[in-house]
Regions:
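HotDog/MaoC-like acyl-thioester-processing domains
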Residues: 1-4, 62-63, 74-130
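Hot-dog-fold acyl-thioester-processing enzymes
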Residues: 1-52, 106-130
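Preference for bulky hydrophobic residues occupying beta-strand positions
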Residues: 6-8, 55, 71, 85
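Hydrophobic beta-strand-centered segment that forms part of the acyl-chain substrate-binding groove
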Residues: 35-80, 95-96, 102
């Protein structure tokens, strides 16, 4: 499991005083940044694309208190994998998300099988309870 602490910025609040819903996908992507870097040490040559992201907003998130993003691998396929993410503020679940990433060959514009070395790493973070 990967853990990332996000410190909300005042600019991320909306008129109702809590963090805007458009901010959360950015935070979730920060939560799986380590996974992106495993596949693409050189960000000028990416090898993953996001093909799906679903979020459930469970509770408002407020400025002034850190948010913990937990990321685990939910499912692994031949050329894709699904991440499960949860965001907590003060120990309270605030957001739950599922994101599908595809190992992608930009030269052919087609999915590419995930190399065994990366499969092994993903399997280390596979969660049976997600």
């Amino acid at each position: 499991m990967f853990k990332k602490i996000i410190t909300p910025r005042i600019s991320e609040t909306n008129i109702t005083g809590h963090i805007g819903h458009t901010v959360i996908p950015v935070w979730l992507e920060e939560g799986y940044e380590e996974i992106i870097l495993l596949f693409s040490r050189n960000l000028a040559e990416p090898s993953l694309i996001t093909v799906n992201m679903n979020m459930d907003f469970l509770h408002e998130i407020f400025f002034g208190k850190d948010v913990e993003i937990l990321t685990s691998v939910k499912k692994i396929g031949t050329s894709s994998f699904v991440l499960h993410q949860e965001g907590y503020q003060d120990g309270k679940p605030c957001v739950r998300a599922s994101t599908t990433l595809v190992h992608f060959d930009y030269s052919t514009h087609k999915p590419d099988p995930i190399p065994k070395t990366f499969l092994d790493i993903l399997n280390e973070h596979l969660s049976v309870s997600s």
